[in-house]
Design a protein with these regions (language model features):
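Helix-biased detector of long, well-ordered alpha-helical tracts
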Residues: 7-357
């Protein structure tokens, strides 16, 4: 036999005598909807994603809807590298959408998972990503109930991209949004900023960073709802400072709620390892992405109670009061610096660290 390869993107699967494909790496044939697509689903996806709503493998999930309000959110994840200290793209994909639902005051219930896989992706890596997604879904008490998988030619994506969309129910009495924010409220931050960006950047560029520096990526829904259960009606706004970081979120709050904001630079926690990298490379921690932090705008009367609840969770043990909303300087954020000056915080024109989520 003579085999002629007509180009580098030819999909030449390795098949054994029983007709089973070589399962070490993803091939284009895994995305054609045929037998190998089914084998991929059965051997890897259903290995970790199993529940009654997903089991029928229908074109979508069918689930009961209770009375009340729903929150719906979606996000796509293209982080490079796909694996980084403390997590991977799968952890990010579940926690990111779970946290977006939580920022709406919703209890996360259902999640979709769309996978775009690069030809040649090692199945060992895919397996680890899916396993992590299942672990995070369990931790957040959310079910992955529907999904889709596509395979594209090598070089068209970077290993794996993931889209997740989530649905959650908003409890009665909870009203979270920019419309609730008014002057005189307290601004609380649940912990130190910048860990995620620096952990990803360190992995990407091979920096010699401390082993203790890991992504802060975590599902925040249980912590958030512990706060809402305690003082829900007194919480005006919840935001997670992901892309663009704390500085961007504060500026957006000022613009959307038409208030001024003043925050204390010395009150904002930044871990020493993160600050050191920022000092060396010229990064501003205010604009570094976080994947396990929440900004809360609350009535001053409940600030101490909120901090007490947050301190009871690992994700909130470093929570602090960082500032207040004002009835002047509308749409502006003033950062009271350590040396006594005031610096205006605005939106960045360009990313400091690209592709961190």
């Amino acid at each position: 036999k003579v085999v002629v390869l007509l180009g580098t993107n030819m999909d030449i699967p390795v098949v054994d005598r029983r007709g089973r494909i070589n399962m070490e790496r993803v091939r284009l044939v895994h995305g054609n909807g045929g037998r190998f697509s089914h084998e991929l689903t059965e051997r890897f996806i259903l290995k970790y994603f199993t529940n009654d709503l997903l089991a029928p493998l229908h074109d979508g999930a069918q689930f009961p809807v209770t009375a009340g309000r729903m929150a719906f959110s979606t996000d796509s994840y293209v982080v490079q590298p796909a694996f980084f200290p403390g997590g991977n793209i799968g952890k990010l994909a579940v926690c990111g959408t779970v946290n977006d639902l939580a920022m709406n005051g919703a209890v996360p219930q259902y999640l979709s998972c769309g996978l775009i896989l690069e030809e040649g992706l090692a199945f060992e890596e895919l397996d680890e990503i899916l396993r992590t997604m299942a672990e995070m879904a369990t931790a957040a008490n959310i079910q992955i109930v529907t999904g889709d998988t596509k395979v594209v030619k090598k070089g068209e994506v970077d290993k794996i991209y993931i889209n997740t969309a989530g649905i959650g129910m908003i409890p009665d009495g909870i009203d979270i949004g920019p419309h609730r924010v008014k002057a005189g409220m307290d601004i609380i931050l649940s912990g130190a900023i910048g860990d995620h960006s620096i952990a990803v950047m360190g992995q990407r560029f091979g920096l010699d960073l401390s082993d203790s520096l890991k992504t802060d990526c975590a599902p925040l829904n249980k912590m958030v709802h512990a706060v809402l259960d305690k003082v829900g009606s007194q919480v005006a706004l919840l935001r997670d400072p992901t892309r663009g970081g704390l500085g961007t979120v504060l500026k957006e709050i000022a613009d959307q709620s038409q208030v001024g904001i003043k925050v204390e630079e010395t009150a904002i926690p930044v871990h020493d390892e993160v600050q050191s990298v920022c000092d060396i490379l010229g990064y501003d921690p205010l604009y570094l992405a976080n994947e396990g932090k929440v900004v809360l705008v609350v009535e001053p009367a409940v600030t101490d109670q909120v901090l007490q609840v947050l301190h009871g969770f690992e994700e909130g043990k470093e929570a602090v009061l960082i500032g207040k909303t004002l009835d002047k300087n509308i749409g502006k954020v003033g950062l009271q610096t350590a040396i006594g000056g005031v610096r205006l915080v605005d939106l960045l024109g360009e990313d400091q660290v690209p592709r961190i989520c």
